[in-house]
Amino acid sequence: MKPPRTQLFTSEEYESRIQKTRELMDQNELDVLVIHSPENIYYLSGYQTPGYYWYQSLILPLNADPVFIAPPHEAALVPEFSWIEDSRIYPDTSDWPKVTGEILKEIQCDSNSIGLETKSRFLSVEVYESLKYMLPYSRLASGSGIIESSRLIKSPREIDYMRKAAEVSSRGMMAGVKAVDEGVSELEIAAAVHTELDMAGSEYTGLPAFITSGERSQLVHATWSAKRIDMGDLVFMEIPGSINRYHAAQSRSVFVGEPNKNVIEASQVATKALQVAKDSMKEGVPAKTVFEAGSSTINEANIGYKQGRRIAYGIGTAFPPGWDEGDIFSINSDEPRPLMAGMCFHLITTMRVPGLGAIGCSDTVLVTKDGVETLTTHVEPGVQYS
């Protein structure tokens, strides 16, 4: 294994990841895994680029060296970030499924059981059908979930990056809270947040920060606008941070002016629900137990908001268009799997109350054997007052 120029994990950690993946491939009777998801390529090889809108794939045979396929404009990034020695660079105009199929034939995997990430947004129907046509003697099977299952529990180095991402997120949130004032625009708040995120060392994040105010705070995935803050507005902020592609996020709200009874009560409910959910979390606890603890606290308060969906999602390695690992593990009413030490979640008890606005309340937490550690600190959960 040849170390890349920028090595974010030890060779031993990469070797362990490859070995674990191959063990799972063997259990699933797969001879080779063709990987298209940027998170999974990064996890196994270290390779990263925001240019994954172009075709890229990592071919991992059960009993041979991996092969990486990339376009020419990304060629320099392979030795920069990845330990993969066999990289194949092809012209932009290449027939990428054909290239992939020919390499599978070359390494004598064309008549084997081939795993494809059938749940990945980066494996198009066209590519899948082309590979199926090119490899008539192969068994194409789903390889989705194999690498993801290993990503669930974070290693000590991964947790270190998560802590740093959380610190960056917290610094961005502090800057945002400080910037809120009557007459200030959402744009100006966003400028303060992003300046601090960049100065603190954040990379580009899987999703943008969400900064809204007043009635706009009811919009779940809306970003900042030119709207100016009015007296009596709730200003909602959900701020991410990213270090070496590992993410953390948190939500808070700021009330401008003298808060009324409804705002104070809603903030108390959201913060209580967040703490109750945290208190219920530790290794071995079923995910649905955590959901019930947090959601029942909200629902029984009769505040005008009901918690009906997941209360947390896994968070860690991410590239746009998302920062979460919710496709791997989410804490909801139907999830029976137990929590395990080393899992990281974005735990959310944010409430969007009609006529009031968004009560931002969320933290990134690390599950331990005895409980959870809150990674996003500095600004207390719930509503801040300006």
Located regions from the model:
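Active-site neighborhoods and metal-handling regions in enzymes and metal-associated proteins
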Residues: 1-386
